[in-house]
Amino acid sequence: MRIAFLLTCHPPTRPSPIFPEVVRLLRERGTHVDLVYPDERPTDLRELRVEHDLYVLKSGSETSLSLAGALHALGAAILNPYPATAMCRDKIVASRMLDEAGVPAPPSYVVSHPQQLSPLLEEGPLVVKPYRGSQGRGVRIVDRVSELVEDGDDGGGPLLAQRYRQPEGRDRKIYRIGDDVFGVERVWPARTYQEKLGRPFTVSRELREIASRCGSALGLSLFGFDVVISEGRPYVVDISSFPGFKGVPNAAAHLADYIERAAERVTRGEQLLEAPRT
């Protein structure tokens, strides 16, 4: 089997310890693995061909997403599927899809300019974030109208605002790898690598059901989402189509197993995503 990972080149200060291990495990099992860094070199679109059984879209860059879209148009099998990833990367689209699926979330609003949020602040604070983005970049809590200023971190596009929910305890992250669901709780802000790893917690039946709804709504099998528990109720406040899975026990082995099974299904002419277990 031939698998290609579409990746971002991490600086030495931000290593990605899990995915080198995933690649090592796959290669040890006899899989041919290529690492592709779309942001690091030109790609001649005239020469672009589907040369792998499976492409794994790990990178969060716009270049990688567009390249995955071009490969998708040529018939490539991509994990997560390109249409699902594209929806998830747009927080406005993802928020509406999750709401339609009954996923609990704070009330959300879309605006073109920060000042348009002024009337909403009369009812309490808002969490304002760029409609595209990851790793908390550009996200801020706004309490007063004076804080609604133009910010270069917004990326120049529309903004998504969510009603702020006061969290109880630590931040919680839910990860899903196929049908397996994992929970990790962390302090915020996490300053050290150990704090970023957090500690596992047992995922409740309610959170498992929410994870199932998220995956079904967006067509994702590898993803993570942030949960805020406020006044005893869970609220999904963000979702990522292919997170780092930090703090998940044996994450590399779980990922390698799932990616290998996906590639095997493709080579047999079966559907890319596994049917959910019942």
Predicted features and spans:
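Phosphate-binding site of ATP-dependent enzymes
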Residues: 137-218
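A long amphipathic alpha-helix within ATP-dependent nucleotide-binding catalytic cores
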Residues: 191-236, 240, 248-277
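Protein kinase-like catalytic core scaffold
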Residues: 126, 160, 182-183, 223, ...
